UniProtKB/Swiss-Prot annotation:
GO terms for cellular component: vacuolar membrane. Pfam families: Aa_trans. One of its GO terms (molecular function) is neutral L-amino acid transmembrane transporter activity. Keywords: Amino-acid transport, Membrane, Transmembrane, Transmembrane helix, Transport, Vacuole. This is Amino acid transporter AVT3C. One of its GO terms (biological process) is neutral amino acid transport. Residues 60-65, 140-166, 217-228, 295-309, 374-376, 433-436 are vacuolar. It is found in: Vacuole membrane. Residues 1-13 have a biased composition (Polar residues). Ubiquitous. It comes from Arabidopsis thaliana (Mouse-ear cress). Translocates preferentially neutral amino acids from the vacuole to the cytoplasm. PANTHER family: AMINO ACID TRANSPORTER, AMINO ACID TRANSPORTER AVT3C. InterPro entries: AA_transpt_TM (IPR013057).
């Protein structure tokens, strides 16, 4: 079923998507946002996540100046591609008397490319959301393994390390990840997000608190000591840094719901630009301060550099609890897609358990948090954030866009594909290389 564009010379056929559940776990079905400030705040909440904790380590690898340039470039490109999605939906809505039937990224894929478009979007949403959750488990396992004193024979880490090495043949980090598994089976068996919604507020508060503590600690350390730092780490690390930057700004799934809920839609682009600019400044400050404070000793999770004080321990435990409860929120769109395709949209506990097990197994084999951020950013986030928005925009506007617009969309598609392929290869090489 489709609507023909009769008011335009374009022969594009709009495919009306069937009713579908939202693909983004970040937004509920609450009342429409009525102010620009609320939209700004929601952009911040949707984009800023645990990936920020890996930025200082990424700056150590790439050099602080290259890191800044990559963050700014990715921020500008991400905003542009988000707006391409908005423009594409507005164009398709104009074919249907201005009534929007496109509520999510998957709906837009269906409207532009039919079932194939939805399948591609769904696939990369599954990979990206599951990738985020793998990162969460890596963070939890690594952080808990580092919190206790390994030299103390009575410490929890010592007992876990001895148990793992002598009896099970696995590390304490792996045991902590396995320890999360049965509890995640229970949390991910909850049918609706309604009961988990308050946890998203808690997660945002903990994230902001952790960032504030780290920035203060970094500033105090910088005043006492200034380790040697480098501006450029070499072009060989460009793809690595690009992957981490793309991961850090991933939030393309929220842009269409946010634009729909904003009262003054004409100002959405400006509000989104302000939000992305503000986030960029925070990311740059966080990354530079962390690197300046610890130099070559900067760890892949910056909170691990804070030492063993009470404040540091509370922050790290708070982040672990935050990510532990954020896990089911981020897996929810994966469950919706898989259940829609394999159980006719009906709730399926065993499908959810299989997916949680798969995510857990992947987390066990990834040694480094920041390296995995680069992998997810280079692979799925590049496709979702750059390739698909530009491709959909190109297909819908191809008969009325000028040469400059056509070249811009085509260049973004090509750039996204090149970054995805080369960045994925580079990240996998980093993960599986033997580091001495």
């Amino acid at each position: 079923m489709g609507f023909q564009n009769e008011a335009s010379s374009s022969s594009y056929t709009l495919k009306i998507p069937p009713p579908a559940r939202e693909d983004s776990p970040l937004l509920g079905k609450g009342p429409p946002l009525s102010s620009q400030f609320k939209t700004f705040a929601n952009v911040f909440i949707a984009v800023v996540g645990a990936g920020v904790l890996g930025l200082p380590y990424a700056f150590k690898r790439t050099g602080w100046l290259m890191g800044v340039l990559l963050l700014v470039s990715v921020s500008v490109l991400t905003h542009h591609c988000m707006m391409l999605l908005v423009y594409t939906r507005r164009k398709l809505d104009s074919f249907n008397a201005g009534i929007s039937k496109i509520g999510s990224f998957g709906d837009l894929g269906f409207a532009v490319c039919g079932s194939l478009g939805r399948i591609v979007v769904d696939l990369f949403i599954i990979l990206s959301q599951a990738g985020f959750c793998v990162g969460y488990l890596i963070f939890i396992g690594t952080t808990l393994a580092n919190l206790s004193d390994p030299e103390s024979p009575t410490s929890l880490r010592h007992q876990f390390t001895r148990l793992g090495s002598e009896f099970l043949g696995v590390s304490s980090k792996s045991l902590y990840i396995w320890g999360c598994f049965p509890f995640q089976l229970g949390l991910n068996s909850i049918k609706t997000l309604t009961h988990l919604a308050p946890l998203s507020i808690f997660a945002d508060i903990v994230d902001l608190g952790a960032m504030a503590v780290v920035i203060v600690e970094d500033s105090m350390i910088i005043l006492k000591q200034r380790p040697d730092v480098v501006a450029f780490g070499g072009m060989s690390l460009f793809l690595y840094g690009m992957g981490v930057a793309v991961y850090s700004f991933e939030g393309v799934g929220m842009v269409l719901p946010l634009e729909s809920e904003m009262k003054d839609k004409d100002k959405f682009g400006k509000v989104l630009a302000l939000g992305m600019g503000f986030i960029s400044l925070i990311y740059i400050a966080f990354g530079i301060l962390g690197y300046l404070a610890f130099g070559e000793d900067t760890m892949d999770i910056i909170t691990a550099n804070l030492g063993a004080g009470l404040v540091s321990t509370v922050v790290q435990l708070g982040l672990c609890i935050n990510l532990f409860f954020t896990f089911p929120l981020m897996m929810n769109p994966v469950f919706e897609i898989v259940e829609r395709r394999f159980s006719r949209g009906m709730y399926s506990a065993w499908l959810r358990w299989v997916l949680v097990l798969a995510v857990t197994l992947v987390a066990l084999f990834v040694p480094n948090f920041a390296d995995f951020l680069s992998l997810v950013g280079s692979s799925t986030c590049c496709v979702l954030g750059f390739v698909l928005p530009a491709l959909f925009h190109l297909l819908v506007f191809k008969e009325e866009m000028g040469w400059l617009q056509w070249s811009s969309d085509t260049a973004i598609v090509v750039l996204g594909v090149v970054l995805a392929v080369s960045g994925t290869w580079s990240s996998l090489s980093e993960i599986f290389s033997v580091k001495v």
